[in-house]
Amino acid sequence: MKEVNKEQIEQAVRQILEAIGEDPDREGLLDTPKRVAKMYAEVFSGLNEDPKEHFKTVFGEDHEELVLVKDIAFHSMCEHHLVPFYGKAHIAYIPRGGKVTGLSKLARAVEAVSKRPQLQERITSTIAESIVETLDPHGVMVVVEAEHMCMTMRGVRKPGAKTVTSAVRGIFKDDAAARSEVLEHIKRAD
């Protein structure tokens, strides 16, 4: 995979500062291009990561009931405006054939998918498909809720508005009771 070109980012940030009428050589902005390049390397680190890699290690566990990890905090960058959006992901699956993954692997998959220029809808479906393709569970349900700075800082300017997306596969798609169980667990306060 291609590495982030920090030098090119630094040059581009310097040009942006000049284009908005700022002096990139003034004290407060002198190291800004370097800081932004370093930040972009971090926030876009998922570009070189395949979320399916996190599900290669499985535990042979005879558990074919609901597994839910909720409130997985994440942040990403809107690919349309390159401003952040952030929120929580909730991942439920019902293992099949003893293929149980580590709980932290679900959170790592969220990180891998969110740390790139992204759409919330794609984050949601990519996580679900990665689990389906690697673990072959009875069902997967991924719900993502996020606040988008592109709706808060510009345009419609509606702070606090949340977008909710879901990807439903297998038994959760076909069985309303199973789907409702997951949604009730997600809504339940700790």
Swiss-Prot record:
Catalytic activity line of the entry: GTP + H2O = 7,8-dihydroneopterin 3'-triphosphate + formate + H(+)
Organism classification: Bacteria, Bacillati, Bacillota, Bacilli, Bacillales
HAMAP family per UniProt: FolE
Residues reported in the UniProt entry to bind Zn(2+): 78, 81, 150
Keywords: GTP-binding, Hydrolase, Metal-binding, Nucleotide-binding, One-carbon metabolism, Zinc
One Pfam family of this chain: GTP_cyclohydroI
Name of the protein this chain belongs to: GTP cyclohydrolase 1
Pathway: Cofactor biosynthesis; 7,8-dihydroneopterin triphosphate biosynthesis; 7,8-dihydroneopterin triphosphate from GTP: step 1/1
EC number in record: 3.5.4.16
GO biological process: one-carbon metabolic process; tetrahydrobiopterin biosynthetic process; tetrahydrofolate biosynthetic process
Family according to the record: Belongs to the GTP cyclohydrolase I family.
Enzyme class: hydrolase
Gene: folE
Disulfide bonding pattern of the chain: none
GO molecular function ontology, one term from the record: GTP binding
Top-level taxon in the UniProt lineage: Bacteria
UniProt-listed NCBIfam families: folE, PRK09347.1-2, PRK09347.1-3
The protein's assembly and partners: Toroid-shaped homodecamer, composed of two pentamers of five dimers.
PROSITE patterns the UniProt entry points to: GTP_CYCLOHYDROL_1_1, GTP_CYCLOHYDROL_1_2
InterPro entries, A to Z: GTP-CH-I_C/QueF, GTP-CH-I_N, GTP_CycHdrlase_I, GTP_CycHdrlase_I_CS, GTP_CycHdrlase_I_dom
Membrane-spanning residues: none
Organism encoding this protein: Bacillus velezensis (strain DSM 23117 / BGSC 10A6 / LMG 26770 / FZB42) (Bacillus amyloliquefaciens subsp. plantarum)
GO cellular component, one term: cytoplasm
